[in-house]
Amino acid sequence: MAAARVLLLLSGRPESVSFAQSVCGLLGAGSGLGPWPTHCGLKRGQLVLSDKPFPGASARLPLQRPPFCPFAALDQQPRAPGVELPPKGRGVDLGVAVILQSSDQTVLLTRRTSTLNISPNLWVPPGGHVEPDEELLDGGLRELWEESGLQLPQGQFSWVPLGLWESAYPPKLSWGLPKYHHIVLYLLVISQESQQQLQARIQPNAGEVSAFMWLGPDIAAAVAATEDGTETPKHLPQDLPSSVPTVELKENGGAQPLALPTSTLLRTTPGTADSRERVSTGTKFALTLWLQHLGRKSRDGS
């Protein structure tokens, strides 16, 4: 089944986006770092975006891209002769990722296996493509179940859309021309179960996941602060633990605890193709949005 598409409301009607076009650029993003507030219609199997309010818009979300977004770079430079991107008929795909929060305020990240063609060894939240006939939340919950084995009982979770990320792979032009172009919708799904209760039910899909971990706000803040593409790293707390508890899958199908060096999670995207494990840039953005959500809830007293 064909992947769902991202549509933009540019001249009064929804239009598909060509693969090579920068979605942020089409929506009026300048040369700044963003994010840019974007009006969204969250429809079955598709996402309609506009920089202005429109009938049917159900949310206003921050849209962001990395400072080194290859589509933004391609917008600024002439295409060299013989340089080919995917066919003009191919659009921008829609992905969804679930930031699963336990009742004790930790979130689940999974490490993609080293054998995957796209983004191997990256730490990301569970997620993937939305099918054309799926509600976006249903697509996120399906991906959560397929990757982690977790099914959340109806009535025992709440959810809210967090933000949008323009994603490319390879992530930098210095790695090669992009072959994949997505808008990823990050959904915060808040479970009524604790981390311990959720962990007892996790059954990771070894074809996609090689390890998983739960991050609390302190480590998440440090990870989110290591912004890819910045010249000077932000000041990091001196009291960060040297390692983070992780569960790694073994080749025989079992699992074992692993103390992952915290420094691994603080790596940024290198200038040349590299499959060393790190947290994806989009995930850092999503963690920032999650921490902002926690802060608002704390101020509201809820």
Curated annotation (Swiss-Prot):
Where can the motif Nudix box be found?
128-149
Q: Where is the Nudix hydrolase domain?
A: 89-237
Question: Which molecular-function annotations from GO does this UniProt entry contain?
Answer: metal ion binding; NADH pyrophosphatase activity
> PROSITE patterns from the xrefs?
NUDIX
Q: Which residues form a coiled coil?
A: none
Cofactors needed by this protein, per the record, are:
Mg(2+); Mn(2+)
* EC numbers for this chain: 3.6.1.62
Superkingdom assignment: Eukaryota
Cellular component terms (Gene Ontology): peroxisome
Q: Which reaction does it catalyse?
A: a 5'-end (N(7)-methyl 5'-triphosphoguanosine)-ribonucleoside in mRNA + H2O = N(7)-methyl-GDP + a 5'-end phospho-ribonucleoside in mRNA + 2 H(+)
**Chain positions recorded as Mg(2+) binding sites:** E143, E147
Q: Which SUPFAM superfamilies match?
A: Nudix
**Protein family according to the UniProt entry:** Belongs to the Nudix hydrolase family.
Q: What does this protein do?
A: Acts as a decapping enzyme capable of hydrolyzing monomethylated capped RNAs (in vitro). Hydrolyzes monomethylated capped RNA after alpha and beta phosphates to form N(7)-methyl-GDP. Shows low activity towards unmethylated capped RNA.
Protein's name according to its UniProt entry: m7GpppN-mRNA hydrolase NUDT17
List the source organism: Bos taurus
